[in-house]
Amino acid sequence: MTVSTQTHSSLVQGISQQSAISRGTASCDDEVNCFNDVLEGVVSRMGSVWKASYVQGYNDPFVHEVERGAYEKYLIIIEGTNLRVINKDTGQDCTVTGSIAAYLAHSGNARGCFQAVTIGDTTHLLNRQRVVAMGSALSPDRPNKACAFFKAGGYKMKYRLVIRIASTDYITEFETPDNSAAGNAEFITTDYLANEFQDSLNTTIFPAIATDGHGTFTVVQAGSTLIITGPAGLNYDIHTTDGAGDTHFLAFKDTVKGITSLPSKCVNGYQVSVRTTGEADATPYYLEYQGGAGTGSWVEVVAPGVALGLDAATMPHIIRNTGPDTFTVSPATWGQRLAGDGDKTAVDPSFVGQPIKSMQFLGGRLACITEYTAVLSRARNAYVYFPDTAQTELATAPIDYDVSNGSSTLIEHTVVAGGKLQFWGNKQQTYLDTGQEAIKADTTEVMPLANYEYDGECPPKAIGLSSLLFGTAIGPWAQITEVFFRGGIAQGEI
C-alpha cells in the first residue's frame, strides 16, 4: 500500500471514529498533546506551570475554587475529615485556623458529598449527607401568673374577683359608694380599687388557699393592675365581674382575645397568647411585657418551651478568608426564632429532619434545597430562616416552597442561570419564578423548564448570564450539553 503525504490546514474536527474513507479531512485517528485551532491549525498543547509538589493521596476529593482577583486564587480541597486550602499562584498551603472535622465526616466520594458557595470573603460549605436538626435550647417556660386590672371605676358598683382551684372558688368583693359626697370620688379611682383587692387577697384569700393545702400565692400591684403568682405546677383559673357589663374589671391568665384586653402596666416578663377569635384552635401569637411597670410595653416573643433555633452543628459551616493565605473555619451563627409557636406559626424550616442537597444565593437570600423543597432565608440576611413576626407575613420573610411540581423526581442539584434559580433532577428541570415582582412568598411559583436526562453526577455550571453546561452519562459515554436561555427560559442547546 502506498503511503501518501499531504498537508491539512486544520484538524479542528478532532478525533473521529468513522472510517478513513468517510470522515472529512479535518479529522484524524488520534492526536497526542495537540490543540486544534481554526486559524493556527494543529499546535502543541500548552504546557503546565510547576508551582509545588505534595506527597498526598486523594481518591475523589471535593475541590472548590475561590477567586478574589487576578493574583489571589485559592483551592479548597476536602476528603475524609481533612480540609486544606492552597494558594493557586504560589502553590503553598494556607494557614487554616479552627476545626470542623465532625461536620466533614461523610461516606463515599467527597466530590459528591459537598458543595460550596462563596460570597465575598465567606465560603459556605455544605455537607449534603448531614441531616439538619433543631437546637436543644428552648424558650423559657411561662411563670404561673394571672392578671387582673381595672379599666375604669364607677359609683355604686360591685366588683368581684374569683380564683378557682379544682372545684373551689375563692371570692373577694368590693362595692364602691354612691356619688352623694364629693369625697367619694377617691373610691372609684382605678389605683384605689386595685389596692383594695390587693389587701383583700393578702389578708383573706391567700391564707384560705394556703389552709386548703394549695401552696403560697403572692400579688404585686402596678398602678391599676394586679399580678398574681401561684405555685409552680398548680392549675388554677381567674375571672372577674362588675356591674358595668364586665367592662371595668378584667382578668386573664395566659390567653386574651386581643391587645385591647391587655393592661398598659404590668410586670417585666409576663407572657400571654393572643387569639383574635377566642377559639382554642385559632392561630395565636405571643406577647411579653418588657420594661418597668410605668415605662414598659408588650413585645412579640416566642411561645414558651419552643426550640429557639437550628442546631449549628448540622447546618452549613463557614470558611472565612481573613487575610492573604489565612482562613478560619467554624460553624455559622444562625438567627433564632423571634416569634410564634413552631406549630401553627413560625414553623420549623422544611429542611429540618432532612439533608440539604444544594445551596444558592439569589436576590440577597440563601436558598437551601432538599429533595423536594426550597427554603429561602430572610431578605438581606442569609442566616435567618424564621419570620420576624407571627402576626402577618412581611415581604422580607423567609420563603418555604414545595418545588416538586407534582412530580416524584428528586432534586439533585440547583444552579442560578439566566437570572433564575433552577432545580435539576432526572428528566425534570424547573425554576423559581416571581414574574416582575421581588422575591416574596405571595409572588413565588415553580415553573417547568426542561426534561433533559440528567444523572446528577456533576452540578450544572452557569456560563455567563445566559447559558449553562451540564453533563450526563449515556451508556458507557458522557454527553456535555450547553443550554441557552432568554428571559430565564431555555431557548436552544448545542
For the regions a language model picked out, list residue spans one by one.
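Repeated scaffold domains used in trafficking and secretory/extracellular systems
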Residues: 57-69, 103-118, 355-358, 409-413, ...
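Elongated alpha-helical scaffolds
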Residues: 111-132, 421-424, 430-431
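N-terminal beta-propeller domains
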Residues: 1-92, 265-358, 362-410, 472-492
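Long, charge-dense tracts
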Residues: 105, 113-115, 122, 128, ...
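Beta-sheet-dominated scaffold domains
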Residues: 373, 402-494
